[in-house]
Every structure is written in structure tokens, then in C-alpha cells.
Amino acid sequence: GVRGGVGTTTITAALAWSLQMLGENVLVVDACPDNLLRLSFNVDFTHRQGWARAMLDGQDWRDAGLRYTSQLDLLPFGQLSIEEQENPQHWQTRLSDICSGLQQLKASGRYQWILIDLPRDASQITHQLLSLCDHSLAIVNVDANCHIRLHQQALPDGAHILINDFRIGSQVQDDIYQLWLQSQRRLLP
């Protein structure tokens, strides 16, 4: 999303669920240090394991994968300590090996879809993961905050804009939406 709170994690979970309902094999990866995607898949709140947690602890990140259905696998981020949360510069560079792992999974053909819930930050690992993506969606709410951000911050190359939480009866949202129809060429219908 272009900012936190626009529903990116929820949309990622819903898309993963919908694709597996259509018979597609899906891996959904949480790349957000908040580690919230797992909650959309009924993973216990106290579950601390995840791919990043495993890598930081010197373990194999593949062991952190969870089978949700026969066609949907989840790779949670894992829980960071308070110290790690406050000092991301100390650990982010240690996570880059996940990129080659995801490339291998993509090449294996095991999954028709690998969905990555990316944080809205400019970290090195976020840029590395984004470079692996064939397509990207920038999730927005129709509000002044997202409107300003669409004009002030660059979207990833080729990203499409997907509106979430659009309220037809809101005059303010309709006004902003009308502006976007004229100014945002990558707006999904």
C-alpha cells in the first residue's frame, strides 16, 4: 500500500484464499516485520516462528512454512524482539537470502502464485523482494492522505493502483476518485 492501514495485508490474504479456491497453488509470504498476515490464516497469536525469525536465529527459513490447505501455503515473517524492532538496520541486510529462495520456488513450478505482502518502506530487503515480483499492486484508500502520497512518492515500476474501502455515498471520496480517473493512468477498474 501507499501507506499503512489501507488494507494491503487483508487484500493479500483474500487474494491468496480466492486463488486457491479456484484450484491454484499459492504461497503467500509475509515480508512485513509486523508479522500480521499469519492472523488471517488462523495461526495462533503466540506463534513466533517465521522465515525472518529463522534466518536471524541461524536456522533454515524453509522450516517456517505452514500448510493452510492442500493448495495454500503460508510463510510468516516471524516475531521480532523489541530491540530488533527498534534497530532494523542491524538485521535487515541479513535477510537477503530469502530472495534466492523465492526465486528457486518460483522456478520449481510448485506454485502458480507467490504473493508477497510487502511493507511500505524503502529498506533494502523490500526493494530486493519487489524486484522479484512480476506484478505489483499499490493499495490505496480514497482519501486525502493517499491522494497526496500518489503525487509525492514514486510507485514501483509497473505498479497498478487498487482502491480499497471505496464508499459510493461519500462526496469527498467521489471527488477524489474523479480526480484519479483523470490523473492516475495505472488505476485498476
Located regions from the model:
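Short histidine/acidic/glycine/proline-rich micro-motifs that form metal-
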Residues: 3-6, 81, 165-168
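Short strand->helix junction
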Residues: 4-6, 44, 143
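Walker A/P-loop phosphate-binding motif and the immediately C-terminal alpha-helix
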Residues: 1-34
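A conditional alpha-helix N-cap/helix-loop micro-motif detector
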Residues: 9, 94-95, 119
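Conserved catalytic-core segment of NTP-binding enzymes
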Residues: 103-188
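P-loop/Walker-type NTP enzyme "switch/lid" segment
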Residues: 1, 28-106, 112
